[in-house]
Amino acid sequence: MAGAPGPLRLALLLLGMVGRAGPRPQGATVSLWETVQKWREYRRQCQRSLTEDPPPATDLFCNRTFDEYACWPDGEPGSFVNVSCPWYLPWASSVPQGHVYRFCTAEGLWLQKDNSSLPWRDLSECEESKRGERSSPEEQLLFLYIIYTVGYALSFSALVIASAILLGFRHLHCTRNYIHLNLFASFILRALSVFIKDAALKWMYSTAAQQHQWDGLLSYQDSLSCRLVFLLMQYCVAANYYWLLVEGVYLYTLLAFSVLSEQWIFRLYVSIGWGVPLLFVVPWGIVKYLYEDEGCWTRNSNMNYWLIIRLPILFAIGVNFLIFVRVICIVVSKLKANLMCKTDIKCRLAKSTLTLIPLLGTHEVIFAFVMDEHARGTLRFIKLFTELSFTSFQGLMVAILYCFVNNEVQLEFRKSWERWRLEHLHIQRDSSMKPLKCPTSSLSSGATAGSSMYTATCQASCS
């Protein structure tokens, strides 16, 4: 643990806090909290040994010490001193024969690094790279960490651009797009909360590692700020699931009911999307504070407490899956009613299905009911890969389907381009032929007619 942490170790610790939407069960992959607890116990044992062991027989020797990494006995002058790799390391079982080395000089002083007051030591046999397993769990977790970081970054960028587009064009302001904007906001907040959590843990871990302040790791995990960051992430994730549910319910109401009071129903949707998650995230935080107030709330000693959050999210996933099935049935019936050939029906059905999966979060059903405490080994990796990869890129797919390839958005861009082109052409004509005035009445009437037609179209499609 001396020095800055390697990428594998950091990815492992970050993923220990991710899972699907929350803490991992006790007994799953090693966490930062567990590692520092083991380090504390190792330090206690070392300090007891340093106090109780008898002094050496000679007067000249290198003093026994604990250097925040390993426990060193008294050293004989002019010799190498070695101790086994510290057992608190998460990968200690993979380097059972490894040792860390120091050199005791003839003067009875520990050899120091060049141009430094720190003692020299060789811990190459205890490093992660010496474990020999190219497909180790930590390397798999590093791969997942890279995947979900790239996914959230792309999703965040695409969603910000898509939100600006929907807000920038006045003709796109309608109930349907307001719902889309709230869904975009939930994805943006989810990505931001993950970035904040990762950045906080990375900064805290790296700083403590460089300064050998391992107690600072645990004190941060025990701090209010760490728990608030994690509580915020839980709320953002829950709100994201419930805005996906709102999208599904709204889609179904459009298909099932012909007349809707959109102003009233939009207020209801806002209450569901942003309000309902508070009803179970806040109680979960209170229960954790009262009965399981340890670490950064990333561990679940009692999985019943985690069900306070998990069950409402499973409910949202289940309802959206039922809506997905119902919508597919409606699409099939309408395609058959149009007397299309079987090939066209299959193609259109496949297109509709693939489009609805990211929009409703249907992929969540695959592992929705596989609880974290039951996932081990390969199943756990597949579960993590499916959830983290699909969820992180889902915002990007939603932005593409709801905005970038949307016909109304493309029409607005074409209209804006034509308007700019006509205005630019008009300015060029005015500057080159000032005596001649171009009549604008026809252009104005044409533009007005086009705008009215599009407004009516948008209102019809948004109703």
Swiss-Prot record:
PTM annotation: N-glycosylation enhances cell surface expression and lengthens receptor half-life by preventing degradation in the ER.
Chain segments annotated as transmembrane: 140-164, 176-201, 228-251, 266-290, 306-328, 349-370, 384-404
Gene Ontology cellular-component terms listed: membrane; plasma membrane
All ranges on the Cytoplasmic side of the membrane: 165-175, 252-265, 329-348, 405-463
Chain positions carrying an annotated carbohydrate: 63, 82, 115
Extracellular side: 24-139, 202-227, 291-305, 371-383
Domain of life according to the entry: Eukaryota
Compartments in which it is found: Cell membrane
Membrane topology recorded in Swiss-Prot or TrEMBL: Multi-pass membrane protein
UniProt-reported outcome of changing residue 89 to A: Abolishes stimulation of cAMP accumulation in response to GLP-1
UniProt record, GO biological process: activation of adenylate cyclase activity; adenylate cyclase-activating G protein-coupled receptor signaling pathway; cell surface receptor signaling pathway; hormone secretion; learning or memory; negative regulation of blood pressure; positive regulation of blood pressure; positive regulation of cytosolic calcium ion concentration
Regulation: The allosteric modulators NNC0640, PF-06372222 and MK-0893 inhibit the increase of intracellular cAMP levels in response to GLP-1.
Signal peptide start-end: 1-23
Keyword Cytoplasm applies: no
GO-annotated molecular function: glucagon receptor activity; glucagon-like peptide 1 receptor activity; peptide hormone binding; transmembrane signaling receptor activity
Entry keywords, A to Z: ADP-ribosylation, Cell membrane, Disulfide bond, G-protein coupled receptor, Glycoprotein, Membrane, Receptor, Signal, Transducer, Transmembrane, Transmembrane helix
Reported effect, residue 121 to A: Strongly decreased stimulation of cAMP accumulation in response to GLP-1
Site (Interaction with the endogenous ligand GLP-1): 121, 128
Cystines in this chain: 46-71, 62-104, 85-126, 226-296
Residue ranges that the Swiss-Prot or TrEMBL entry lists as coiled coil: none
Oligomer and partners: May form homodimers and heterodimers with GIPR.
Family: Belongs to the G-protein coupled receptor 2 family.
Name of the protein in question: Glucagon-like peptide 1 receptor
Organism expressing this protein natively: Homo sapiens
Organism lineage: Eukaryota, Metazoa, Chordata, Craniata, Vertebrata
